[in-house]
Amino acid sequence: LAHGIFAPVLPEIVSADGLAALIAVEDAPDPVRRLASLLPADSDRAGAVAKRLKLSKLTTKRLVLAAGRRPADAENPRALAYRIGLEGAVDRLMLGSQAAAFAELDGWAVPTFPLSGGAIVARGIKAGPEVARLLQASEAQWVAEGFPDAARVEQIADEVVRAAV
């Protein structure tokens, strides 16, 4: 970096501090995560780098997700993993030097929302956009409560439907 060898290919790299911090916490080297550590936390710029380097669609998506990191990611790591995927959440937390939050994902599997639109219709709501809205509200509450069991999800759905009627 000091000799400018990356400048022709990756002028976005201005510091190796992020890479040094990542190396200190990673168990095994990950090339995509290491590249992300060298880039600014800017999804648009990461997308431009991925295009210039002709990365695969999957790698581009991962790099762009990692570049979207922000301090708020550590507030609810499991909600982050549910929203963007476990790998994306791990990338963001490791790149943000948020090891304590990263530890919360160790051994955790992203759950599947146990409710469908049919469960909302069964509660007396006519099929249509309102069902989707109520299902999304139920899912948001489920995530906010830390992914409670199916019995609590049923209660959440009842509460959401009751509030809408």
Regions found by a protein language model. Give the residues of each.
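Conserved, hydrophobic alpha-helical core segments of structured domains
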Residues: 1-100, 165
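Charged substrate- and nucleic-acid-binding regions of tRNA-handling and nucleotidyl-transfer enzymes
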Residues: 91-165
